[in-house]
UniProtKB/Swiss-Prot annotation:
Keyword tags: Toxin-antitoxin system
Organism: Bacillus subtilis (strain 168)
Assembly mode: Forms a complex with cognate toxin YopC.
Role according to the record: May be the antitoxin component of a type II toxin-antitoxin (TA) system. Neutralizes the activity of cognate toxin YopC.
Gene behind this protein: yopB
Protein name stated in the entry: Putative antitoxin YopB
One term of GO molecular function: DNA binding
Record SUPFAM superfamilies: lambda repressor-like DNA-binding domains
Length: 75
């Protein structure tokens, strides 16, 4: 599972969702979804803007957690 770490990053830096969306010139509802970890798809331009603005790497913004669901790869 991939989850967003945006909430902890901007909360720690005391940056609001509204300020971030305004500063990176991206729609507030989309940034809010990333903040709340509600996104099903991650737009590349948004990821690029957020990482550049916050001066972070993509792996700091998006966290991969192994799922407990077993997937059978035997074919």
């Amino acid at each position: 599972m991939i989850r967003s770490n945006l909430k902890s990053i901007i909360d720690e830096r005391k940056i609001s969702i509204r300020k971030l969306s305004r500063d990176i010139d991206h729609e507030y509802p989309t940034v809010r979804k990333l903040y709340n970890d509600e996104m099903e798809r991650y737009p590349r331009d948004l990821l690029d803007k957020v990482c550049t603005y916050l001066n972070i790497e993509l792996q700091e913004l998006l966290i991969f957690e192994k799922s407990h669901n077993h997937i059978d790869h035997s074919g």
